[in-house]
Amino acid sequence: MTKRASQTGNSREKLHCSFCGKAQDEVRRLVAGPGVYICDECISLCNEIIAEEPQSGEKTAIVGDIPKPTEIKKILDQYVIGQEQAKKALAVAVYNHYKRIFHNERKAGDVELEKSNIMLIGPTGSGKTLLAQTLARILKVPFAIVDATALTEAGYVGEDVENIILKLIQNADNDVKRAEMGIIYIDEIDKISRKSDSASITRDVSGEGVQQALLKIIEGTVANVPPQGGRKHPHQEYIPVETKNILFICGGAFVGLTDIIKQRVGVKSIGFHSNEVVNDRGRKIEEGESLVHHVIPDDLMKFGLIPEFIGRLPIIATLDELTIESLKSIFTEPKNSLLKQYQKMFDIENVKLKFTESAIEAIAQTAIKRESGARGLRAIVEEIMMELMFQIPSRKDVLEVVVTDDTVLKKEAPITILKGDIEKIA
């Protein structure tokens, strides 16, 4: 017994940490693994190294290299046709937002720059979401889109406002530090306007209540985000997220807003039998010019947004309603235009795809009639191309497909040019 005990004791004395080489009696604890040992000191050192690693990568790709407003707009031009005023406003706002972050982090001077979130106002399909998505891609920051109509204030059926932060964390591969520098686009923000421009004693859980709930998050606070989403409850753990550096872009169509603006600017008579709409500064609003470009915070208050909420979104960028010409350009010109995407899909099958000018005109006219904007273009083209895309992969005799206006307007089949036809001509 004694001999075995002493042998065991001797064997224990020979145990050493596989990493630092210290003996068992030189450290407080030695943890054994399959053929290896690690002491408590090495474990502590490993924890410190792991804790330091996220800090080295917590800055986004834009640190020290924020694209200038002119550079941002130039890239936006590749993806979004028209909307010059909105692109310039967004380029300046985004540049100033990230410049502010780095200024405040360096604590340069006594002046702390305040956060400026953005309100995008424009018709359905005018490019609001695409602008926000493209900005996030330019800046290489996490991006999340949420629908304001799904949100309700705490205590009611629906999503808590903190869940919008969770989507950003998920899109940042669960890297909270990266998410804290991201962009959140809240769509259909006009749908959470209160039902009248006067305060009500009745509960408006999807309107004014949601605006109140969003205030702190948009302004900047430490939000406690439930890791699994859904409603909060007292016994779950939360992810603390600092929102002061998250850029919030809120977008909406604001149907009826132009009527409010028109009531404010009024119609003034100039000379005999002539009426001209002028803005508050007396400048004539030209025929065809959208009244939405003359929106002021008071108009949004009358629409149903509360003053505190409007104050958190000081930058207002407005988008024009799309015309037939702009829809034609959107279909053909951008870097990843719908035309180029479909041509690429057919090219993979070794088939050329062509749309005649009259076909493109007809597609744009159809989108205008449906009031679906740019996003309606894909649905129209899908209807036209569905049967062809079903057949083409199985056919090896098709050389080229030509879509005409009759294909769009009369639902006739596109013209197909077969390889045999070319051989006969030759």
Swiss-Prot record:
Alphabetical list of SMART domains matching this protein: AAA, ClpB_D2-small, zf-C4_ClpX
InterPro entries in the record? AAA+_ATPase, ATP-dep_Clp_protease_ClpX, ATPase_AAA_core, Clp_ATPase_C, Clp_protease_ATP-bd_su_ClpX, ClpX_bact, P-loop_NTPase, Znf_CppX_C4
Ranges for domain ClpX-type ZB: 5-58
Cellular component, GO, one term: HslUV protease complex
Instruction: Tell me the GO BP annotations in alphabetical order.
Output: cell division; proteolysis involved in protein catabolic process
Family statement drawn from the similarity comment of this UniProt entry: Belongs to the ClpX chaperone family.
> Quaternary state and partners of this protein?
Component of the ClpX-ClpP complex. Forms a hexameric ring that, in the presence of ATP, binds to fourteen ClpP subunits assembled into a disk-like structure with a central cavity, resembling the structure of eukaryotic proteasomes.
Q: Could you identify this protein by its name? A: ATP-dependent Clp protease ATP-binding subunit ClpX
Q: Which organism is it from?
A: Leptospira biflexa serovar Patoc (strain Patoc 1 / ATCC 23582 / Paris)
The gene name on file is clpX
